[in-house]
């Protein structure tokens, strides 16, 4: 039987379809991908190649919960739910259910002079999370960075528990994060056990200084905010300063120096993850969003480079 000249399913890169964005001819490139609806490349980011899978959560959307859920178990509306243990070493379910899903492009760069794109994914009900959500990720390239808008709409007929995050790795141009200066303006940090699960909370004055050999995998709360409601994390190198900002929908920030990553990625970039809720929120209920039928949650964050 003869084969068609044009394949029914043309080959696609492991990272999915590529959406190349740029704010004008001289703007820095921003690349969103259909695998997980995340970011592969962008100003101020330590990204990954088109032919790679995103390791360490790199650039991925984390929903309907971020970070770890203890034993993958939680109760909602009087019903016990069990999710697959996606991180067996810690007996936790980590970073949600949409990281490896194929997202659909609903608005491409051709309609925005190359500046923006919108991807969406319908999360279907499944064992452990029997709710239906419409997730939308919108990316806009700027002359000095980019903006991300993430939203979730409850398509089910019952209230749905929800949390979100995103997992960019920042780079200030240093070979290792050790040589960068870091400022996190926060009033508390969670204490955790050896599984990375919360055991308590303590007051801090954030973090301000050279990263050096510090091993960070910390969840910061009580975030200081400017008059615009934004919290910021600043990473400074000799050649550039990278600022990640997050609006009030993001109540927590996870900062991770990447010490557990593969050697070629270890401490090359600093993960700064905007989180709507802390780890284990599906079980604890802390800062968990309750989406009523038809209700939409929206959070915005972005990066500027100077």
Q: Where on the chain are the PLM-derived regions?
A:
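Beta-strand-rich N-terminal accessory domains
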Residues: 1-83, 87, 229-249, 295-305
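Acidic, contiguous internal or C-terminal segments within carbohydrate-active enzymes
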Residues: 10-14, 121-173
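Acidic/His-leaning functional-site neighborhoods
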Residues: 17, 92-106, 213-284
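Active-site/ligand-binding surface loops and adjacent short beta/alpha elements
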Residues: 56, 159-161, 168-249
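Short alpha-helix capping/helix-loop boundary micro-motifs
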Residues: 66-68, 282-286
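A short, structured loop/turn motif at beta-sheet edges
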Residues: 75-79, 106-117, 140-145, 174-178, ...
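Extended, loop-rich substrate-binding clefts of extracytoplasmic carbohydrate-active enzymes
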Residues: 84-143
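Beta-strand-rich interaction surfaces with strong enrichment in secreted/lumenal proteins
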Residues: 136-138, 286-291
């Amino acid at each position: 039987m003869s084969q068609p000249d044009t394949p029914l399913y043309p080959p696609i890169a492991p990272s999915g379809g590529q959406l190349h964005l740029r704010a004008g001819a001289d703007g820095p490139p921003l690349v969103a991908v259909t695998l997980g609806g995340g970011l592969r490349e962008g100003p101020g980011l330590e990204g990954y190649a088109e032919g790679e899978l995103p390791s360490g959560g790199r650039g991925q959307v984390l929903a309907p919960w971020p970070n770890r859920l203890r034993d993958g178990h939680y109760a909602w509306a009087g019903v016990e739910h069990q999710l697959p243990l996606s991180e067996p070493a810690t007996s936790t379910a980590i970073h949600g259910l949409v990281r490896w899903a194929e997202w659909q492009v609903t608005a491409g760069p051709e309609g925005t002079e190359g500046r923006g794109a919108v991807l969406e994914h319908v999360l279907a009900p499944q064992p452990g999370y029997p709710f239906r959500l419409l997730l939308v990720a919108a990316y806009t390239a700027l002359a000095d960075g980019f903006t991300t808008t993430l939203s979730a709409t409850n398509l089910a007929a019952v209230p749905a528990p929800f949390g979100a995050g995103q997992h960019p790795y920042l780079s200030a141009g240093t070979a290792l994060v050790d040589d960068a200066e870091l400022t996190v303006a926060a009033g508390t940090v969670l204490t955790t056990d050896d599984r990375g699960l919360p055991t308590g909370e303590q007051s801090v004055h954030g973090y301000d200084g050279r990263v050096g050999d510090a091993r960070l995998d910390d969840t910061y709360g009580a975030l200081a905010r400017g008059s615009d409601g934004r919290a910021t994390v600043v990473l400074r190198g000799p050649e550039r300063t990278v600022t990640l900002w997050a609006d009030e929908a993001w109540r927590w920030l996870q900062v991770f120096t990447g010490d557990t990553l593969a050697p070629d990625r270890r401490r090359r970039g600093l993960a700064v993850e905007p989180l709507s809720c802390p780890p284990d929120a599906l079980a604890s209920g802390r800062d968990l969003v309750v989406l009523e039928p038809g209700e939409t949650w929206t959070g915005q964050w972005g990066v500027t480079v100077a």
